[in-house]
């Protein structure tokens, strides 16, 4: 509400619209907002990342990205690659009939390599830096990944079952095992989540771990107090 008030105070004559999940739930809501903006019936369009998804607007003089650091600090090994893609897409939306528009990015990390790559539109440098980083920290394409997620309504039961799995996995597999940790969103539909991440050097190692974990899961399923805990195994998670 304060943002709306501030916007009206700064641009009293401007017509503005929001584009997010709430405002595009209706059958034709998305298209209606897009068409209105294309016809210049809307002066300021404020929204989430969906604004960048394949939309090509003309006559945009200024694009602003709020909290760019959210993209850079997201807990995912692909975060920097995705940040570059999104910010480059956003920058590409700005311009009037062949003239260059302006892009403003709010950040506490103006010297961050990804911010510099975006400003310089240097995909090759971003690509090479990301390859080196992933090789150093054992991430794809240099390893395969298995993500194991456990879910339960009981916080205590989830932690206890996670401790059991952690001990048994590490006793039976001597490769790289990370976790268990709570993901950024740790409770969905009234269930708590915890995750393991297994890093595997090749397909043989992946198959060996899957065979080991199938036996572990059988033992886990036989423990009555953990019967409600759900296990999801995701190979090469996206």
Locations of regions flagged by a protein language model:
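Accessory helical-bundle/CTD segments and flexible terminal tails appended to RecA-like ATPase motors
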Residues: 10-17, 26-74, 89-238
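Short, small-residue-biased leader/transition segments that mark boundaries at the very start
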Residues: 1-5
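Short, conserved loop/turn and helix-capping segments at secondary-structure boundaries
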Residues: 77-84
């Amino acid at each position: 509400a304060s943002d709306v008030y501030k916007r009206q105070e700064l641009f009293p004559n401007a017509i503005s619209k929001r584009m997010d999940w709430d405002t595009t739930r209706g059958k034709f809501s998305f298209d209606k907002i897009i068409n209105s903006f294309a016809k210049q019936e809307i002066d300021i369009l404020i929204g989430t990342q969906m604004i960048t998804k394949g939309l090509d607007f003309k006559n945009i003089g200024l694009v602003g990205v709020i909290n760019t650091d959210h993209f850079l600090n997201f807990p995912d090994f692909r975060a920097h690659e995705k940040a570059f893609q999104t910010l480059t897409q956003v920058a590409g939306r700005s311009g009037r009939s062949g003239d260059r528009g302006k892009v403003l990015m709010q950040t506490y990390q103006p010297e961050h390599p990804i911010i510099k790559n975006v400003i310089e539109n240097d995909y090759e440098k971003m690509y090479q830096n990301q390859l080196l980083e992933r090789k150093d920290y054992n991430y794809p394409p240099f390893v395969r990944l298995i993500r194991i997620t456990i879910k339960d309504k009981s916080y205590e039961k989830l932690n206890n079952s996670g401790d059991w799995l952690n001990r048994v996995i590490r006793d039976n597999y001597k490769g790289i095992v990370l976790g268990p940790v709570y993901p950024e969103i740790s409770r969905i539909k009234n269930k708590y989540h915890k995750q393991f991440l297994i890093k595997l050097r090749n397909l043989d190692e992946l198959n060996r771990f899957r065979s080991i974990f199938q036996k572990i899961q059988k033992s886990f399923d036989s423990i009555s107090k953990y019967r409600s805990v759900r296990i999801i195994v995701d190979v090469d998670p996206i």
